[in-house]
Curated annotation (Swiss-Prot):
Keywords: Acyltransferase, Lipoyl, Transferase. This is Dihydrolipoyllysine-residue acetyltransferase component of pyruvate dehydrogenase complex. Its cofactor is (R)-lipoate. Pfam families: 2-oxoacid_dh, Biotin_lipoyl, E3_binding. The active site is at H385. Residues 132-169 form the Peripheral subunit-binding (PSBD) domain.
Length: 412
């Protein structure tokens, strides 16, 4: 008897997804646990494993199909010897969803441009045998290279006056529409991840009252400790500590001290989190994902570093599970490696805070009334004012600065 392969729900909130790719073709033998397809969710590409054994008799939903509802029929397995008519009858009985192949229908076609629209021009004819204009209007027209034939006078008997020249704008009807050569650009359809990013960040900027606080941190001691740790573990590359690892740990410790910054907004109540779960923004080919370091405040720097490396690798390979990127109470976005000094990040709802981290650089500072050189890192907190008041945001940044500038406090 034919066996249904259904669109899986990869998270409790998932209602539909994109069937990105089939890894098996019709007629192939399929074993339990074997990866047969890839499903694109709003944050990652997930593998679909076969549960049953059989022959992949029919692919109902082709690859590159969008918005496939959960639990809809995407393929059929059959046993040896089953007839094609039986398979077709089984599909007709069980399939109520039509595939939605990915298309560029909403994108402009390369050869469609506004130059193809018939140009309609209204020509206004004037009697130019004699033009009446004031001397000042004539001087202004000459200075501005304006032809009197194009100007309608508002003075007595149509006389052109100063104000007519000052208020004159060329008719748009005579401006030739310039078309772009379709070879000057390329069209890339928006994948599901990009659409979700656009939707969520637009919603955030439109509905969340952002405010921003910045602070400077001296990272000289942190860099010294990092160098000592990496020298000690020089033979084991997997334990190499990054500055970002220290930043994550410092945020975790600061949230432990200022728990009111570890919260999210709800219409009826503010949710304060007991766990310190930190989302870390990671750039991938298709956009951005935020894998989560859970209970970050309970981990030492080596544990946190190893876990972060594993999460980044899975993110780059599109192998994150929903549990690894859904949730989190606070986000870190670090653009320091690109030389960015500071920036205001957009809050990732329903979280109430995101911290943008800039590059470390040598600067002149005043210490004990003396000018000296220090390595300074700028960080900017974007906070939801419905949840986090200015004083709470300031307390958090002060606590973060304390741990960054005295890193030994994070290690004991």
């Amino acid at each position: 008897m034919p066996i249904k392969i259904l669109m899986p729900a990869l998270s409790p909130t998932m209602t539909e997804g994109n069937l990105a790719r089939w890894l098996k073709k019709e007629g192939d033998k399929v074993n339990p646990g074997e990866v047969i397809a890839e499903i694109e969710t709003d944050k990652a590409t997930m593998e679909v494993e076969a549960v049953d054994e059989g022959i992949l008799a029919k692919i109902v939903i082709p690859q590159n199909s969008q918005n496939v509802p959960v639990n809809s029929l995407i393929a059929v397995l059959s046993e040896e010897g089953e007839e094609k008519t039986d398979i077709d009858a089984f599909i007709a009985k069980n399939n109520s969803v039509s595939p939605s192949p990915k298309t560029d229908a909403n994108l402009p076609k390369p050869h469609e441009n506004i130059a193809n629209v018939e140009e309609q021009v209204t020509v206004i004819k004037h009697d130019v045998s004699r033009i009446f204009a004031s001397p000042l209007a004539k001087r202004l027209a000459k200075m501005r290279n304006i032809r009197f034939e194009s100007v309608k006078g508002s003075g007595p008997h149509g006389r052109i006056v100063k104000q007519d020249i000052l208020s004159y704008t060329p008719s748009t009807a005579h401006n030739k529409i310039v078309s772009r050569n379709p070879e000057e650009y390329r069209l890339v359809p928006n994948n599901n991840i990009r659409k979700i990013i656009a939707k969520r960040l637009l919603e955030s900027k439109q509905t969340v009252p952002h405010f921003y606080l910045s602070i400077e941190c001296n990272v000289d001691k942190l860099l010294d400790i990092r160098e000592d740790i990496n020298k000690f573990f020089s033979e084991d590359k997997s334990t190499r500590i990054s500055v970002n690892d220290f930043i994550i740990l410092a945020v975790a410790k600061a949230l432990q001290e200022v728990p009111n910054a570890n919260a999210s907004w709800g219409e009826d109540a503010i949710r304060y989190y007991n766990n310190v779960d930190i989302s870390v923004a990671v750039a991938i080919e298709n956009g951005l994902v935020t894998p989560i370091v859970k209970n970050a405040n309970q981990k030492n720097i080596l544990e946190l570093s190893r876990e972060m490396k594993a999460l980044i690798k899975k993110a780059k390979d599109n192998k994150l599970t929903p549990e690894e990127f859904q949730g989190g109470g606070f986000t870190i976005s670090n653009l320091g490696m690109y030389g960015i000094k500071n920036f205001n990040a957009i809050i990732n709802p329903p979280q109430s805070c995101i911290m943008g981290v800039g590059a470390s650089a040598k600067r002149a500072i005043v210490k004990n009334d003396q000018i000296t050189i220090a390595t300074i890192m700028d960080v900017t907190l974007s906070a939801d004012h419905r949840v986090v008041d200015g004083a709470v945001g300031a307390e958090f940044l002060v606590a973060f600065k304390k741990f960054i500038e005295s890193p030994v406090l994070m290690l004991i």
